[in-house]
């Protein structure tokens, strides 16, 4: 599956290779096998191109068909095929100037050049004069001016890339500056064929021969594409949610890619989109890769390159995705995130950029990327979107269209649908089980408490979705429900006496329940806490092979004591410093009982040294701080009315009147960004890290949940979350296969 990358062959590029004359005679082809392939591969409608092509890719088919017709005419073979090809061109000639049609790169220059070549071959083309005149006019405008100016490096690269359309007027010395170590120009057989025809460069020939050796008697429109295609397969498997079924294969791809990265391989570093994808996937998987590589792809440099000149949407999209894998003190990625975000937003609004496929498909991908940033995109939501938008027959287009059979894989889609729906059935059973648990623990009798079981379970199912993680999901969801209950109890439901009573009961743990409760509320909450903590401890023993219940108790005690501190501040109208508030606040935000016990339930064994490792504390603190600040930013107005302490209001108070609300919020948002990037660094780093990656991932998963909940407002009150949760838990995804 990963070993052999299968690209569709390109009639267009094959035709240009076929038109190379022999070294011995200009009357004979250098590669007669390519001419034979053209003879053998005309489609039933008289065209050459990909079968079942998209209705908006007629220009591409016309370009390929004319190139093949020229090759046959040049060598005086296939007269019947030539006539059928000309008939196809005549019947579809209105598409040549149709602006709704997708235009291949360089089409407005290359196609008119082929028309002139047809005249030289005394080939009578059945095109109306107004069609030809319109094309020649566009060609002349493009050649004389160019949208980016005639002297930019991007413009030069563009003219070099479409060298076959410039012909004898080309500056071939300039073109050869783009020759790669493999002998090609831009990894393009058609460009390389044109260069070899004019210059007889030995390295160009060696490249063409190597491609034909691999593909037989035809060539693809781009070669090699192995590194990019394998990375794209990894990306697709992750987005479909089935990467866990291919861990060995993915590991081999990552190791090979990292080796190429360290070697400075051209296939990565001369191709912006491959470089960006390699950086993102390697960094996310724990490999040590520096963002310094993007120095060559800064905004100015990018727009002075071929991709920038073309305003290539997919490449900018990949740069944008890479920029989100951001560590602290990486200004290069911060700037990259800013300009790529701006470019993509403009792309959506104007549609003026280049897309290497039907625009509606690219638009959907860009829209999702902008609305679902990496730090707010829950895995199961990504999986569902990717399944629903997966195109088995995805066609991309450069100078000619192509497909990669490895990435357009029907089996991937079928497995993803089955996996999603199987997991969903398990999730539905667990949610019903949790509903019974709420009733059994009498939590529904606590009138002051918000009932948020659906949200709590959704956050677990959307991130810890694999069947084998059931214990972790249930722990996550139950503790989510209990932290909500306790939060409401400390906020509005309980007196100070009750709060202290609850804490004392947890501290004593083994108590005579009939004599130590000062209210029924305390009895219900304590009983639910004790039974749930004990249950989690028992399950953790199965995973860990040792007792960890005492750790779970301490996690809860830390939370309860921090909540009591906030309650006492409020009741005494004390105003802590911002530092005092945050030191207490990252604990009182109540993520500890949700995330920390789950660490014992996801697979890796954690030693006592691991549990006490400062790294674990740093992960928790960064997550809790980020969450607290998100809550305080989004909940500022509501909490101010309720008289609650808040990081925004404390920042304004400490400013002694010199800091207004807008400035305070800007400061808080900056702190959120820095804490989030620090957490990501801690999660992804492999060096000097003792905590297993599967455990560290839980902290990042929670950050994603929080950012999704707080993307617009206080997420617990957002009606949109209901449909989002249903998409993960209740609505199966459909398979649209053959």
From Swiss-Prot:
Catalytic activity as recorded in UniProt: ent-copalyl diphosphate = ent-kaur-16-ene + diphosphate
Domains: entry comment: The Asp-Asp-Xaa-Xaa-Asp/Glu (DDXXD/E) motif is important for the catalytic activity, presumably through binding to Mg(2+).
A GO cellular component annotation in the UniProt record: chloroplast
Reported function: Diterpene cyclase involved in the biosynthesis of labdane-related diterpenoids (LRDs) natural products. Catalyzes the cyclization of ent-CDP into ent-kaurene.
Similarity comment: family membership: Belongs to the terpene synthase family.
Binding site for Mg(2+) 3: 631-632, 639
Residues at which Mg(2+) 1 binds: 487, 491
Cofactors named for this entry: Mg(2+)
Amino-acid positions noted as binding Mg(2+) 2 in the UniProt annotation, renumbered to this chain: 487, 491
Enzyme category, top tier: lyase
Name of the encoding gene: KS1
Keyword Cytoplasm belongs to the record: no
EC number: 4.2.3.19
Molecular function via GO: ent-kaurene synthase activity; magnesium ion binding; terpene synthase activity
Full protein name: Ent-kaurene synthase-like 1
InterPro entries: Isoprenoid_synthase_dom_sf (IPR008949), Terpene_cyclase_plant_C1 (IPR044814), Terpene_synth_N (IPR001906), Terpene_synth_N_sf (IPR036965), Terpene_synthase-like (IPR050148), Terpene_synthase_metal-bd (IPR005630), Terpenoid_cyclase/PrenylTrfase (IPR008930)
Keyword annotations of the record: Lyase, Magnesium, Metal-binding
Recorded metabolic or biological pathway in which this protein acts: Secondary metabolite biosynthesis; terpenoid biosynthesis
Gene Ontology BP annotations: gibberellin biosynthetic process
Origin: domain of life: Eukaryota
Motif (DDXXD motif): 487-491
Bound cofactor: record note: Binds 3 Mg(2+) ions per subunit.
